[in-house]
Amino acid sequence: AFVSRVFHAAKEMGVHTCLDTSGFLNTNYTDEMLEDIDLCLLDVKSGDEETYHKVTGGTLQPTIDFGQRLAKAGKKIWVRFVLVPGLTDSEENVENVAKICESFGDAVEHIDVLGFHQLGRPKWHELRIPYPLENQKGPNAAPRERVTNQFKDHGFTVY
């Protein structure tokens, strides 16, 4: 509710709005709230349910549903996909993510392929939550190039 009030006030002042989300709270966003979103940075963590759950503790479907709602509402989407070696970098997973993105149609302006990093680790420690990616390394250039090309093969602009 707080974000929607801020976005509504911003729109009244003519300010561009951008929601950064995994889409997990899909059903908490009413269609009326969607009206005040100009752009959504939508994190699609994985195209595989089991991997998605391992990375987030949640389920994939709310992210898909939210992306489809955004597309139906005519909102622009920048999909963000984090490349985690040995976890999200398989060809099959990337194909699944590409198919999810295709279900959003022309709403997807581009896909950002982001290399995994450990900058969030202190947050997990501070919250005293076990960090499942504690010893995870970041990607090297080879899988990043393959993943980028896989998305491009589906017609997406990729950064």
Q: What is the role of each PLM region?
A:
Residues 99, 105, 109, 124-150:
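A structural motif corresponding to the C-terminal lobe/cap of the Radical SAM core domain
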Residues 1-119, 125:
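Conserved AdoMet/S-adenosylmethionine-binding subsite of the radical SAM
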Residues 76, 142-159:
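C-terminal accessory region of radical SAM enzymes
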